[in-house]
Amino acid sequence: KCTSLEYKSKPKVINCLVCDLSFVPESSYPKNIETIYAEVQDPTYLLIKRSRYKTFQESLKQISPFLPDKGNLLEVGSYCGFFLDAFKKKYSSWDYIGVEPSKWASEYARSKLQINTRTGTLEDNIQKLASDYDTVVAWDVLEHLNDPLGFLIKINSVMKRDGIFCFSTLDINNWLPKLMGKHWPWLMEMHLFYYKTDTTEQLLNKAGFNILRTEKYIHYVSINYLAGKMIAILPDWLEKPLNIARSVTPQKIMIPISFGDIKLYICKKEKPVGSM
């Protein structure tokens, strides 16, 4: 769970000397990873609902100049439906659908937000989806996949020619992971691949996409949530002052966080490619 405050267990990450891609060896993958995603429940995510909406509203501002006036959108890894809920309020004339492996999260999206959501992975649902989406988005998904190229090719297959694909993922070549090393908060067991801008571009080109723009991905977080993250990774002597800060700061205050270690990519489908 990416909202977890536990960082004690760190994966073994190796770097390919040929392609420069960093990844966790398959032998070190969490056992039954697909079942884990299907069964995951994360009430903490619901507690940070306001900040997630603010984050997705910011993402919409970043991608909006590239979207047509009307169309259909697919979100892969739609989780509890917060992005799609923000999207439908801004783009009421669009059709949209989400795909989410977590049974708990997809049911929340359907029952609480009335978001059209299919349970399962993209591969599970690909035969039931359209093949002409104007836009596909996938926020914080690519690092979780054991076959990122295969995933991108499947994304390509459900999109219109010249369709727009927007996603966020990690940039391990950024200054922050270099500075923090093993204490970098996004170094966690459920993240299998760690990208750099050039390795991400190589994958996208192989999958038939061209990058139109790369930007910093902006997270909005409450002071309380940020302090909790910091307590988990900083020296113990800082725990007391951080807890004091949590206790005296109004919970409604949210701040933008953008160190550049997570990038937002806006891409265009240039050509179809063969299925994997």
Model-derived features: positions:
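Conserved N-terminal segment of class I S-adenosyl-L-methionine
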Residues: 1-139, 149-152, 216-217, 228-229, ...
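A short glycine-rich, Lys/Arg-flanked "PGG" loop and its adjoining helix->strand segment in the class I
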Residues: 149-164
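Short N-terminal helix/helix-N-cap motif within the alpha/beta-hydrolase-1
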Residues: 146-150, 177
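A short His-aromatic
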Residues: 140, 144
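A SAM-dependent methyltransferase catalytic signature shared across enzymes that methylate proteins
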Residues: 198-215
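Short, P/G- and charge-enriched loop/turn segments at secondary-structure junctions
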Residues: 2-3, 188, 248-256
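Short, glycine-/aromatic-enriched active-site segment of Class I SAM-dependent methyltransferases
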Residues: 167-193, 198-203, 229
